[in-house]
């Protein structure tokens, strides 16, 4: 697809909501009376991609149901620099976790997308494919070489395409063009220069052993520091709605219904003792009417790592003893549903800097912020076209075998191409725990535990499908994860001690600057860590009883029911989860079409 074609596609998306005949704001009579081959629940990365690929076959009629609305081109969604405004907005499910033991018993806000595009419409837009070792571990756990990196390459090639950044600068040396293809999702490197950019890159030449430069972390080997690739095109956010679904808008065999929740999956009968789960129940409110729909071939749950297990448990699919205790009649005894929840822990670490030219100015100066928005509206340039950080680092702890052995643990990463922790650069103050200072200018490293060992769960709050489930990601729930975060903070300190920062860094800020011993660091970490918003694994594929799904993502013990979202991941990728969810959906669609 040429840049001109993408521009035309983007223009179409900007107006399509008002003219699309197959977008319904609720379950109309027309929808309820139609027959669909596949019904997909949830329009995020998994559901949006699967709906698009399945509807490429004109003989397959697809219904895509989204609980949220259709305003996926809202200004706050479209402007990358406004991503933080989307948390606790009308585009967020507004979940909150239970108190996290590993975070000093603090509950935390748990954002999930509630709009066409799902969490791809509210995330920080980092695009990562994952690593060779990540997928090879999936293949081993699932007992299916189809999930290996080598076998997934055809699906990776269908996924992304590199485009020019907003400022059209020369991107030579910022990514490897030979590993990017003509895929559906346009991505780019940062389109607005920051004064810290050369300092970050220079550090990789000054401290190459500890912080090697990585030309392109999407090669399958993430280790090193490199330029962030983001789902941004022409300075606009790219979501599954503006990419995959945009390609499918005019297909007569795809209907999309928004503002509608799937409350449970229904059995239509039995075959060989297994329930045929091709029915769904839908409603728009807790007090409103319910309706039922049936799929001829399959129901696909793509509601995400929180809502997919929630729907399954409400449908009687889960741990039978637990469901009985909650007043739900068990249909399929599948104890692993809702378990294995894991996530990447997030910690903002900030330094005062010798500069008055940082992104802190946008937060404090309303006039400057208005000027930046006006500039973005005119030509897409300026600081509001930036996502979370212009560079990413993926690193392993030194002497990993000895490090984890001393903790009485095995190396939790998938292998040498996969990181233990991540470092994200930000030209300004960052914290999910501390309010931004009213004075001073900052540089921050976000550190993240990228191969966590802690596991949590999703459980029922009640049998009312409009009640949020109980969410426990168990962040920093093991001493291993705390130790890895401690190493990440130490690495961030070592990074800014390089000569490249000697005239820039002034001092560490706040509680960060008061934490020196390991004990002090651990206390600082527990009191300031949050989530990076990557929940996975709650309906994971795997061999035997340990897997809720088989290797082709079918729910065990059922017929006609599949899961296509990050809940299917047996292990979290050592990277951000948007890209791997798209990859999973690409293969899932091929598997489904192969059975049509």
Give a label for each model feature:
Residues 2-596:
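N-terminal redox-cofactor-binding region of secreted/periplasmic oxidoreductases
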